[in-house]
A protein has these predicted regions:
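Membrane-cytosol interface segments
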Residues: 2, 11, 94, 103-111
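Helix-loop-helix junctions within predominantly alpha-helical proteins
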Residues: 5-88, 125-229, 241-255, 259
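Central hydrophobic cores of alpha-helical transmembrane segments in multi-pass inner-membrane proteins
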Residues: 67, 95-99
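Generic preference for well-ordered alpha-helical elements
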Residues: 89, 109, 113-116, 155, ...
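Alpha-helical transmembrane segments
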Residues: 98-109, 218-232
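Internal catalytic or translocation cores that form aromatic/hydrophobic pockets or channels
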Residues: 109, 115-134
Length: 273
C-alpha cells in the first residue's frame, strides 16, 4: 500500500514513502532512457560519468547510422526497381526519424529534467490520502501505457529483424555456387560484400542491435509523453477535488475561501506549465 497512515480514520497521510511513489511513476521510462543515454543526469554528476554518457550517445548515433548509410548507398548505386526502393524507403524513414527523435531527447534534457522534478515535487507535497490515491492510480495507468508501448515496439522489432529474415527465401547466385539470405537493410557491395560468411552474420546481428536501439528510442519518446500526460491528468483530477471543496473546505486546505481559491489557481497554472 502506498502512503502509510497512522489511523484508518485519518484522511491525511502523515507517513509515506514518496521515493517509492516517484519510482512508480518513472521506473520503466527511466530504465529505457538510461539504456540509450537520454535520461537526464543530476547536476552533481562527475566529469567521468558525463563523458561516458556522451560516448554512449555517439555509439547510439553510430549504430543507427550503420543501418541508414549503407542502405542509402545501396539504393543509389544498385537498385532500379521502384517498388523495392519505395519498400526500403519506408524502413529507412523510421530509422531517420529515430535519429531525429534521439537528438530531440538529447537537446531537451533540461526540459525533461524539469518535468521529472515537477513529478518529484508533486509527490513530496501530496499529503492528503484521497489525493495520493488519485496520483497512484494515474501513475499505475501511465506505467501500463509504457508497458503496452514497449510490448508493441519490441514485438515489432523481433518480427522485423529476426522472424522476417529467417522466414525469407534464400537467394542463389553464381550458377548455384552461392546461396545466402538477404539482410533486412541491404549493404552496397562498394562498401563490403555481405553475401559471404562470417561477414553476413556480423552485419545481421549488428543490424538487429541497431534496429532494437531505433525501436527503443521511439518507445522512449512515446512512453515519456505518456508518463507526463498521465501525471498531469492525475493533478487535474486533484484540482477538480479541490474545486469541489472550495466552499466548505477540507482538512488539508486553508480555512479562508479566498486563500483556497488562490491555491487552486496557482496549482492550475503549475499544471499548465
Amino acid at each position: 500500500m502506498y502512503g502509510t497512515i497512522t489511523e484508518k480514520t485519518n484522511t491525511v497521510a502523515t507517513v509515506y514513502d514518496y521515493k517509492k511513489d516517484i519510482r512508480l511513476s518513472v521506473q520503466l521510462i527511466r530504465w529505457m532512457m538510461e539504456m540509450i543515454g537520454t535520461w537526464p543526469k543530476s547536476t552533481m554528476t562527475s566529469s567521468i560519468e558525463r563523458y561516458a554518457y556522451t560516448l554512449l550517445n555517439v555509439i547510439c548515433i553510430a549504430l543507427i547510422s550503420f543501418l541508414v548509410v549503407p542502405a542509402i548507398i545501396y539504393i543509389v548505386l544498385e537498385m532500379d526497381n521502384g517498388y523495392l526502393i519505395l519498400k526500403l524507403s519506408g524502413a529507412l524513414s523510421f530509422c531517420v526519424l529515430a535519429i531525429v527523435k534521439y537528438f530531440s531527447l538529447i537537446f531537451h534534457k533540461e526540459d525533461i529534467r524539469n518535468g521529472i522534478k515537477y513529478i518529484e515535487s508533486d509527490w513530496i507535497n501530496t499529503r492528503y490520502y484521497s489525493d495520493r490515491i488519485t496520483m497512484i492510480r494515474s501513475a499505475k495507468f501511465g506505467q501500463h501505457l509504457v508497458a503496452i508501448c514497449m510490448f508493441f515496439m519490441y514485438g515489432g522489432a523481433v518480427f522485423f529483424y529476426l522472424a522476417l529474415p529467417f522466414s525469407a527465401s534464400k537467394i542463389t547466385e553464381d550458377e548455384g555456387n552461392l546461396t545466402y539470405q538477404p539482410l533486412v537493410y541491404p549493404v552496397a557491395r562498394v562498401i563490403i560484400d555481405v553475401r559471404h560468411s562470417p561477414v553476413r552474420e556480423i552485419f545481421f546481428w549488428m543490424q538487429c542491435l541497431s534496429g532494437f536501439l531505433a525501436h527503443s528510442i521511439t518507445a522512449s519518446g512515446c512512453s515519456l509523453a505518456a508518463v507526463f500526460a498521465m501525471h498531469a491528468y492525475g493533478r487535474m483530477e486533484i484540482l477538480i477535488q479541490w474545486i469541489e471543496h472550495l466552499i466548505d473546505g477540507r482538512k488539508d486546505l486553508c480555512d479562508n475561501m479566498n486563500e483556497r481559491l488562490a491555491i487552486i489557481i496557482e496549482h492550475h497554472v503549475r499544471i499548465l506549465r
